[in-house]
C-alpha cells in the first residue's frame, strides 16, 4: 500500500472545494507581509488564504512547508489500519465524527514507524464540516509543539474526510475528571496537566501569526502515558488579529460553559477569550466539577459564576476543593492556582493575564508538596433526631483537623515517606477500572452523551 508524502499541490485541487465564504473578519484580502527574519523562509499559511483562489494558496507550497511530514492515506489503507472501522476499535464520537483506534505497521510505508493511531472520520451530518476538517489540516500541518497533538496524515477521497493522529493512551482530561469509574487525579498531576495545556496555548498565542484556539475545554485536552497534556481538535481555531486590529469578528462558536462572556455577547474574538476558557478548566481541576452541570441547583450550574467569588478566600476555597482529593494537596499551591483562575475569569478581558504569564505562575506550583489539609478529616455528621448541623459545624471540624495535624508533626518522617510512596504509585492509581471508559484519540474515550450529568454542548452559542 503506497502512502504519499504530503504536498500542498496534492490537497488543494481536490480538497479546497466547497470552502465557505469568508467570515466577517475577512473583509478584504490582506496585503502580503514581509516574512519575519526569525522564521527564515517559512511563513505560516493563514486560513484567510483559503478564501481567495488568486492567492498564493493555490501555488505549490511544499517548499515552504517541507517540514510538515504529513502523509496522504487512501481510504482503503485506513480501513486496513482500523480493521474496517471495527466496533471493537471504536473510541468514541465528538462534534467532528466517530473516532477509531488503528495500528500502522512497518510495512505500510518505509520511514513511517509502526505505531498505534487514532483515525477520526468526518460525519457529514455532524456539527462540523469540510471547512473544520481543512482548518485542522492546515493548522496542524504547520504547527509543532510538545503540547499540541501530532497529526500524522489525512485522507481526502471523494466525499470522505479523515484525520490520522498520534494515539493518546490516557484519553481526555474530561474523562479523567468526570467518568464514573475513573480514579481521582492527584494534585501534582492536575497541576502538570494545567501547565502543559497552558504551554500549548501560549505557543499558539505567541506564534509569528497568532492562533486563537476558540474551543479550549477539558474534552480537547488529551493525555499521554505520562499525563502530559496536548491540545487537540483545531477545527474551530482562527488566525488572530494582525497589525493594529484588536480582535477578530466571527460567528460565535464553541462550547457552553467555557466561552468568554464578551465573545458570546459581541462575537469579538481575542487571545483573552482563550484565557477565560483556560480559567474554567483550571476551576474544573480545582473543584472536580463540570463547567456546566444542570443536575445541580440553579445557583451552582455555571461553575465559573458560582465559584469565582470564593477563589480569593482561603476558608471558602477549602470548601469547594474537589472532595476526591481527600485533602491531599498543597494549600499554598491551591491558593495560588485559585488566584490565577480568578484573574483568568475576569469579566474585563484586559485584566486577564497573558498565557505566557499563566505559564510562569503555574511552573513553581509543581514544586509544592502535597500535604494533608484540614478538611481531609471531616466526618459526615449523623443526627439521630433528623435535625441539621449547627452553622459553625464545618468551622469546628476544620479547627479540630488543624489541631490533629499539629499532633502529627512528630510523625512527619512517616507522612513524608507515605507521600513518596503515594507518588511512586501514580501510574497505578490512574489505571481505569473499566476498559469501556474513553476519550477522543484514546481507548479511554467516553463520549459526552455517556458521561454522567454531562451538559456541555459544542454549538453555535446564541
From Swiss-Prot:
Outcome recorded upon mutating residue 421 to A: Normal phosphorylation
Its EC top class is transferase
Q: Which Gene3D superfamilies does this UniProt record tie to the protein?
A: Phosphorylase Kinase, domain 1, Transferase(Phosphotransferase) domain 1
UniProt source species: Gossypium barbadense (Sea Island cotton)
Please describe what this protein does: Required for pathogen-associated molecular pattern (PAMP, e.g. chitin and flg22)-triggered immunity (PTI) involving reactive oxygen species (ROS) accumulation and triggering plant defense, including defense-related gene expression (e.g. PR1 and LOX). Ensures specific recognition of the EPD1 effector of Verticillium dahliae, resulting in a hypersensitive response known as effector-triggered immunity (ETI), characterized by the activation of programmed cell death to limit infection by the pathogen.
Q: How is it modified after translation?
A: Phosphorylated at Tyr-165 and Tyr-167 in the presence of pathogen-associated molecular patterns (PAMPs); this triggers the expression of pathogenesis-related genes (e.g. PR5 and PR16).
One GO molecular-function entry: ATP binding
Q: Which residues carry this modification: Phosphotyrosine?
A: 165, 167
| Disrupted gene: phenotype observed | In plants missing both EIR5A and EIR5D, enhanced Verticillium dahliae virulence leading to altered accumulation of reactive oxygen species (ROS) and reduced activation of cell death. This phenotype is due to both impaired V.dahliae EPD1 effector-triggered immunity (ETI), associated with cell death, and compromised pathogen-associated molecular patterns (PAMPs)-triggered immunity (PTI), charaterized by ROS production.
Tissue spec. comment: Mostly expressed in roots and, to a lesser extent, in leaves.
- Gene behind this protein: EIR5A
Identify the EC number(s). 2.7.11.1
- Which cellular component, as a GO term, is one annotated location? plasma membrane
* Highest taxon above the source species: Eukaryota
Q: What is this protein called?
A: EPD1-interacting receptor-like cytoplasmic serine/threonine-protein kinase 5A
Provide the reaction this enzyme catalyses: L-seryl-[protein] + ATP = O-phospho-L-seryl-[protein] + ADP + H(+); L-threonyl-[protein] + ATP = O-phospho-L-threonyl-[protein] + ADP + H(+)
**Signal peptide residues on this chain, from the entry's feature table:** none
Cellular compartments annotated: Cell membrane
Keywords, ordered alphabetically? ATP-binding, Cell membrane, Hypersensitive response elicitation, Kinase, Membrane, Nucleotide-binding, Phosphoprotein, Plant defense, Serine/threonine-protein kinase, Transferase
Outcome of swapping residue 167 to F:
Reduced phosphorylation associated with lower induction of pathogenesis-related genes (e.g. PR5 and PR16) in response to pathogen-associated molecular patterns (PAMPs)
Q: What induces it?
A: Induced by the V.dahliae elicitor EPD1 (AC G2WWH6).
InterPro entries named in the record: Kinase-like_dom_sf, Plant_Ser_Thr_Prot_Kinase, Prot_kinase_dom, Ser-Thr/Tyr_kinase_cat_dom, Ser/Thr_kinase_AS
Active-site residues?
215
Q: Where does ATP bind?
A: 91-99, 120
Report the family membership.
Answer: Belongs to the protein kinase superfamily. Ser/Thr protein kinase family.
